[in-house]
């Protein structure tokens, strides 16, 4: 077998799974007009309004200010009094207000009606 055949075969073996992953992800996360991906983390494909996406980014930026200095009973990501984990996905420990956490849950619940 020639080096060229091996190289082409190797490229195909690498490229095919990548193409499949990209097209599958896009198909699963196609937002209706007027909605965008929330992007509260990489691969967060919940469809929300642009204002809601901006809010999630602001929460991410401000979250460290709402963590209990030195940690607490829930570890280093324990929130200060009056704040809770956002829980937009399993493991989301960004500290937000209880109202903001409920908004994230509402966004998750509405996602099906915001996707194509």
Model-derived regions, located:
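Bacterial N-terminal signal peptides that target proteins for export
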Residues: 2-14
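Intrinsically disordered/low-complexity terminal segments and short unstructured peptides
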Residues: 4-6, 22-23, 92
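Post-signal/leader-peptide non-cytosolic segments of secretory proteins
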Residues: 28-116
């Amino acid at each position: 077998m020639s080096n060229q055949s091996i190289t082409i075969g190797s490229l195909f073996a690498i490229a095919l799974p990548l193409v499949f992953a990209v097209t599958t992800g896009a198909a699963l996360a196609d937002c209706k007009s007027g909605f965008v991906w929330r992007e509260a983390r990489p691969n967060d494909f919940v469809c929300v309004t642009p204002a809601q996406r901006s809010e999630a980014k602001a929460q991410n930026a401000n979250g460290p200010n709402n963590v209990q200095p030195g940690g607490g009973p829930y570890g280093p990501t324990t929130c200060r009094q009056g704040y809770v984990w956002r829980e937009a996905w399993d493991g989301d420990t960004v500290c937000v207000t209880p109202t903001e956490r409920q908004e994230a849950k509402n966004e998750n619940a509405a996602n099906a009606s915001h996707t194509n």
